[in-house]
Curated annotation (Swiss-Prot):
InterPro entries: Citrate_synth-like_lrg_a-sub, Citrate_synth-like_sm_a-sub, Citrate_synthase, Citrate_synthase_AS, Citrate_synthase_euk, Citrate_synthase_sf. The keyword Transferase applies. Homodimer. Its main location: mitochondrion. Its EC number is 2.3.3.1. It comes from Iguana iguana (Common iguana). This is Citrate synthase, mitochondrial. GO terms for molecular function: citrate (Si)-synthase activity; identical protein binding. Residues 1-31 form a transit peptide. The gene is CS.
Length: 469
């Protein structure tokens, strides 16, 4: 009988140990300190030594092949990054430091009386690989509350943006302006040792995560609530609860939804646009504010962070055309018309996943519990029964199953947040938990400047022996 730590657990999953009866996966609660930085300081030398030994033994080992199609196809499937905080399994979905979403829902601490995991706990897990105690999560909540205040120039900036400036543009600009507060940029200019980089990246990351709800809430209030005040941070409340209050929502169910939303959107391994962007920009030793702002510019792209909006637009058009109570056959016909016109069914399929996205599943379970009779949810549930079969009949989709975007917008709409242009800002606030966790480790492990080799088409043709004419 073997008990696995978080890192060993993730490796065992990859090696197929999930079917072995001789292995028991144990939730790892190794550290007792409530100070996250102290816990990290103890972990980092051990991880540095582990990786150094691994590279000495296996540094020249070949791990895969690169094809011409990979270069032209967005580097899909190419193993080219180290990203510690999460791994995306095609069949099981995302694993945060080895833990699936259902496991995180079960093991991570909750708010008093709550049923959903607190994002503070997920952040602790991403940074340390350990399931935190309630006391450790409470420490993170208090720490973020202490660091949340915005500098006056950022407040002035947000209050003077034109109302036609997209919420994501406002988020990116405000985060960039926070660079004035960077402890890392200041320390780097003073010549700190490379071994100390991670300490200042940690401080900036904690500050940024703490301030993001204030920035995001201010954007929301300015655009959609006539500039009304976001109020003050309550140090007795958790991060999501404070964020929801500042947005102007007090429904306990919506607060629970926000805890779930901010947890499940936090990380999706390192190859997606926002995660890779933060890793790339951070490798130039840009501070976390600049790296995260760059990531948000990537998230703002329609192929990355706008998919949940596209789902809602498609659902709204469907309802307008067919009404609320639609037969399965009419839905099938509508889906086929969508496909035959050269469009896709938004919210279905994924670049890596080959099963239903577990982030979809947990949102579906939330809806079944809290809003089972909502017409839009009932439509989404009906589509879940029909769309995959139609896509399989069509024969083009590698993955006919729903992803996270097929559901999140419906839940937000139900609780009154109907401003679709804003949804990607929520996504961005959540994604900070993952990409900044990795940024801390990238500097702790001394990852170098990212600089892959590019090729021209002519050069590639010469390399493979093709005729260039």
């Amino acid at each position: 009988m073997t008990l696995l730590t978080a890192s060993s657990r993730a490796a065992a999953r990859l090696l197929g140990a999930k079917n072995s009866s001789c292995i028991i996966f144990a939730a790892r609660h190794a550290s007792t300190s409530t100070n996250l930085k102290d816990v990290l300081a103890n972990m980092i030398p051990k991880e540095q030594a582990r990786i150094k030994s691994f590279r000495q033994q296996y540094g020249s080992t070949v791990i895969g092949q690169i094809t011409v199609d990979m270069l032209y196809g967005g580097m899909r499937g190419m193993k080219g990054l180290i990203y510690e905080t999460s791994v995306l399994d095609p069949d099981e979905g995302i694993r945060f430091r080895g833990y699936s979403i259902p496991e995180c829902q079960k093991l991570l601490p909750k708010a008093p009386g709550g049923a959903e995991p607190l994002p503070e706990g997920l952040f602790w897990l991403l940074v340390t690989g350990e399931i935190p105690s309630q006391e450790q999560v409470n420490w993170v909540s208090r720490e973020w509350a202490k660091r949340a205040a915005l500098p006056s120039h950022v407040v002035t900036m947000l209050d003077n943006f034109p109302t036609n400036l997209h919420p994501m543009s406002q988020l990116s600009a405000a985060v960039t302006a926070l660079n004035s507060e960077s402890t890392f940029a200041r320390a780097y200019s003073e010549g700190i040792s490379r071994t100390k980089y991670w300490e200042f990246i940690y401080e900036d990351s904690m500050d940024l995560i703490a301030k993001l709800p204030c920035i995001a809430a201010k954007i929301y209030r300015n655009l959609y609530r006539e500039g009304s005040s976001i109020g003050a941070i309550d140090p007795a409340l958790d991060w999501s609860h404070n964020f929801t209050n500042m947005l102007g929502y007090t429904d306990p169910q919506f607060i629970e939804l926000m805890r779930l939303y901010l947890t499940i959107h936090s990380d999706h391994e390192g190859g997606n646009v926002s995660a890779h962007t933060s890793h790339l920009v951070g490798s130039a030793l840009s501070d976390p504010y600049l790296a995260f702002a760059a990531a948000m510019n990537g998230l703002a792209g329609p192929l990355h962070g706008l998919a949940n909006q596209e789902v809602l637009v498609w659902l709204t058009n469907l309802q307008k055309e067919l009404g609320e109570d639609v037969s399965d056959q009419k839905l099938r016909d509508f889906i086929w018309n969508t496909l035959n016109s050269g469009r896709v069914v938004p919210g279905y399929g994924h670049a890596v996943l080959r099963k239903t996205d577990p982030r979809y599943t947990c949102q579906r379970e939330f809806a079944l519990k809290h809003l089972p009779k909502d017409p839009l949810f009932k439509l989404v549930a009906q589509l879940y029964k029909i769309v995959p079969n139609v896509l399989l009949e069509q024969g083009k989709a590698k993955n006919p199953w729903p992803n996270v975007d097929a559901h999140s917008g419906v839940l937000l709409q139900y609780y009154g947040m109907k401003e679709m242009n804003y949804y990607t800002v929520l996504f961005g606030v959540s994604r900070a938990l993952g990409v900044l966790s990795q940024l801390i480790w990238s500097r702790a492990l001394g990852f170098p400047l990212e600089r892959p080799k590019s090729m021209s088409t002519d050069g590639l043709m010469v390399l493979v022996g093709a005729k260039s004419g």
